[in-house]
């Protein structure tokens, strides 16, 4: 295996910092609702209630309830976009408001870019149009089908709605894509873009989308929410999927300070590898190399890591590989550093899951509290997994991990607030 791919997120005179968070998760809409539930160790997993799903073998998921896209998104965008893009448009609005970033802060539309990640695309919109095609004929298929299903739809619609004309793109790296999108945003900032809106949202719970996922052996078929997603335990039986996601505002530090923005965190380092689909034993080396690459880029020693947000797939072989990868990369510190996986309370939102973890990591560093891992009690690996209740701490450096079902591995290092040139 060759060395990990580093994206150049750390170092250099132009430092990428996080100034705004926008969250839509099964815990609720907005940062406050999400953080309260995460800090309390609440689980929002429940029975799948979407229409047309009752006959499917997937019984438990993390649904976003009470979301009304019309409250934040204009009709002209709603009619041509899927639910996953509705999430992205709304989360972007929340993130920009959180960053206090408005039209007056945009020197030029070319100074603001958009990077998202997507794994399932517009399945709900696509299902409706396919039903029109086969039930009524091609004349009943709307023109927006050609764009609404596409993975890049959210990037395009966010940029159009906000008149952002800087570097734009979409990352297709399976579940690791969320971290990779943030890394690409940081790289764009380092290369001269002042601001990048980045993140991932997913809506994979329409019947058509669920059917497409049933081929994943890693998908949990458990029928009880408290048993469906329990990584790092002997009872692990896969993961429960989820919808929702998060969008972040990433800015060049000097530009952010000039406009008086609060620097929430610094994107210090990132690296990625690829080990192939379903090869969970091999993912040990790939993930370890990604961790080592991210730490090297951040100029971070293993013992400086204060908290790890685990990928936590919920498959015994994959969980074992992740625990061993942490030991390989962090050495003795791997058994001492607090590890958490709050996604067990929301479900695994594919590309959006690690972006939610990044948002949660920023909040954990700000609040001095490491959230617990819901549903997990008896850990069968040599990890200090935070369970039961949140743990008071003063984390200043967070390591966020992500792996995709197709073999992508990604690691990201965040530092609390601004980081002086000499490091921590």
UniProtKB/Swiss-Prot annotation:
It comes from Streptomyces coelicolor (strain ATCC BAA-471 / A3(2) / M145). This putative ketoacyl synthase lacks the active site cysteine. Its EC number is 2.3.1.-. Involved in developmentally regulated synthesis of a compound biosynthetically related to polyketide antibiotics which is essential for spore color in Streptomyces coelicolor. This is Putative polyketide beta-ketoacyl synthase 2. Residues 13-416 form the Ketosynthase family 3 (KS3) domain. Gene3D superfamilies: 3.40.47.10. One of its GO terms (molecular function) is 3-oxoacyl-[acyl-carrier-protein] synthase activity.
